[in-house]
Amino acid sequence: MSKRDYYEVLGVDRNASVEEVKKAYRKLARKYHPDVNKEEDAEAKFKEVKEAYDTLSDPQKKARYDQFGHADPNQGFGGAGASGDFGGFSDIFDMFFGGGGGRRNPNAPRQGDDLQYTMTLEFKEAVFGKETEIEIPREETCGTCHGSGAKPGTKPDTCSHCGGSGQLNVEQNTPFGRVVNRRVCNYCEGTGKIIKQKCATCSGKGKVRKRKKINIQVPAGIDNGQQLRVAGQGEAGANGGPPGDLYVVFQVKPHEFFERDGEDIYCEVPLTFPQVALGDEIEVPTLTGKVKLKIPAGTQTGTSFRLRGKGVPNVHGRGQGDQHVQVRVVTPKNLTENEKELMREFAGMSGGRPEEQNDGFFDKLRRAFKGD
């Protein structure tokens, strides 16, 4: 099945800014998050949205995608080699020019692979940060042979077939004459070493797989999809090389009352008709507790109030966002006869047409409810 266009997945224009891409991603991530959306295809859609965001939010990846689409020539090549339709061309190219490139020392120190760990956070955990411990499976240097793969007291021998280079020169006859093609040595598997007496602990691999507990300090203000690099906590390196890094990717659960956009928090409070018409002082929940908010007389539904400094702290420690409180007027469903009579009286005073409800509208309302 062919992949959908990333711009189509996020519903953004090809000239969309990073901020627009981020906003679209947050909206869709909340919609398809498996913890919220229980539909069968929600998880697949969530992953599709995440994949599109990872590409379009990175300037270099976006540039490659804009040029090549899903047929990026950088994909499909690397440590594992090319595959599929490129295989035939690769073989021909190797035949005339020699595969494998220049000589590399197979025993040179090599950095270990990076690891990725996905951590799910509650909404407020992402806002305020937390210290936690995770456990990950990873390869570590064998403590018995110290990475050599050989039994203690012995050492690996240099491969006699490739002379320690890890590569063999293979001569081939072609229509253009005899050519030399360089291949990985199949005797030492490219390591340049032969281990006759293997370490019993790691079976000659030089590495063992263990579960490692790592302390993680989640920074306050971390957002959905962001990642934290933990240096040196990836897979073990080879031949004395440094370990890779661990990247912790965060998924933040939605909140039942608050919504987040960057460092700002949004919420909606229901108010009665008399509250917005006459004015009131209400208590509004914030991330740090309740605060009082004055509702001016005549407030319209949809009006938004800003609570400065009540949002999310900047993940880099540069200030804090605001909280936006939007008013929603709730229409009463079960009125008493007395309340209905008051509303009829008010309707008669106001005229019932919006164009007639001028500056004296709320004065009439006050009189109706106060019995003046």
Swiss-Prot record:
Residues 5-69 form the J domain. Zn(2+) 1 binds at C142, C145, C199, C202. GO terms for biological process: chaperone cofactor-dependent protein refolding; DNA replication; protein refolding; response to heat. GO terms for cellular component: cytoplasm. PROSITE patterns: DNAJ_1 (PS00636), DNAJ_2 (PS50076), ZF_CR (PS51188). Participates actively in the response to hyperosmotic and heat shock by preventing the aggregation of stress-denatured proteins and by disaggregating proteins, also in an autonomous, DnaK-independent fashion. Unfolded proteins bind initially to DnaJ; upon interaction with the DnaJ-bound protein, DnaK hydrolyzes its bound ATP, resulting in the formation of a stable complex. GrpE releases ADP from DnaK; ATP binding to DnaK triggers the release of the substrate protein, thus completing the reaction cycle. Zn(2+) 2 binds at C159, C162, C185, C188. It is found in: Cytoplasm. It comes from the Bacteria. It comes from Shouchella clausii (strain KSM-K16) (Alkalihalobacillus clausii). This is Chaperone protein DnaJ. Its cofactor is Zn(2+).
